[in-house]
Amino acid sequence: MTDRVGLLLGLDLTEVGRVAEVLERHGERFLARVFREGEIRRSRRHPRAFAEHVAGRFAAKEAAMKALGTGWRAVAFRDIEIGRDPSGKPLIAFHGRALDRSRALGVLSAEVTITHTRDLAAAVVALVVPA
C-alpha cells in the first residue's frame, strides 16, 4: 500500500524594477530585514544581475509564505532561507516561525524553483505533506 501525500503550493511573481528601486532607496537595511547573511553573500556574487537575483529570492520567500498558508505577518522573511546545492539547484530551509509552521503541517519535503528575466522574477514552492 502506498502512503498518500498532499501538495501545498505557493507562487509569486515579482517585478525586478520594484526590487531595484527598493535596493536603491533602502539598500543594506532592506537586505538585512529580508535575507540571512549567506543569502546576501550569495547574491553579491552576481553584481551584473544583483537586482534580478534578489528579486528571485524575494519571490521564493513570498511563494513559501503562501505555501505555508501564513502570509508575511505570521512568518518573517528571514525565517525562510533560499540556498543552492552544488549543482546550482535552489534549496529552501525553514527557521523560527516558518519551521514551527512547517512542522505543524507535517511537511515531509520542500522544493523551490526560481526563474527571472531582466523585468520579472517568479518562484514556485511545493511542500509535500501527509494527505
Identify the residue ranges that each predicted region occupies.
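Core catalytic alpha/beta fold that binds nucleotide/phospho-ligands
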Residues: 1-131
